[in-house]
Every structure is written in C-alpha cells, then in structure tokens.
C-alpha cells in the first residue's frame, strides 16, 4: 500500500514574538528552535501536512525589516518553490503590513499561497 502524499508547507521565521519561547529558568523570551516545532506545538500533528522550517539567524526585529530582507524572503520562496505547496512567513507585527505590501508586488505571479502572520504572544501560549 502506498503512503499518502501530504501537502507541504515551508514555515519561514523572520523574527518577532511569535517565534519566541519562555526560558523556564529565567522567564525571559528566547528565540525558538523551529527544528523542534512539532514537539513544542503538538496540535500541528492533527493536520495532514508536512511542515518544514527556515529560520533567519539571528531573528530580525521587525523594526529592522528592510528591502534587502524582502529580497531574501523572495529568494527563499523562489529557491523552494518546486518543493512546497505553500509558504507561511512568521513576522514581527510592527512592520508586517509593509512586508506584506512589498511581497504582494514582488511575488504577484505566484500560483501558490504565501501567508504572513505574527502574534503578540510567544509560540505555544
């Protein structure tokens, strides 16, 4: 019997609170290791998707987002376009609207979804 082929999504973490996790010893927020996404967000196991991740290292404070980083996002998407059915960009909320606007022009001819999202709370909260 063949294994089912699930849709695949590339999760791109640029920075922002959504990609932080609380250090249990200090209570401080630290950058989350997205290689451990499924272990830390077990709800994702309910979906029939393959989720891979790419992280900006170090994470970008969204107030520092600029056109060169928009170009980097576009390159990541184009370099991985044939491997994934869609892309989710995790972004800081301060400048997400600017990035979304820029990417809407830079990626206007794509036939796959690109979703931007952020949060005021860290991942898993």
List PLM regions with ranges.
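Active-site histidine-anchored catalytic micro-motif
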Residues: 1-125
């Amino acid at each position: 019997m063949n294994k089912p082929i699930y849709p695949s999504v590339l999760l791109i973490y640029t920075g922002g609170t959504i990609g932080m996790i609380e250090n249990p010893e200090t209570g401080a927020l630290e950058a989350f290791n997205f290689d451990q996404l499924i272990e830390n967000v077990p709800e994702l196991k309910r979906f029939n998707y393959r989720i891979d991740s790419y992280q900006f290292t170090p994470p970008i404070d969204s107030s520092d987002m600029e056109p060169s980083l928009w170009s980097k996002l576009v390159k990541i998407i184009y370099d991985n376009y044939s491997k994934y059915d869609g892309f989710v960009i995790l972004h800081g909320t301060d400048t997400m609207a600017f990035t979304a606007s820029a990417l809407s022009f830079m990626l206007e001819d794509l036939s796959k979804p690109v979703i931007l999202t952020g949060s005021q709370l860290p991942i898993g909260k």
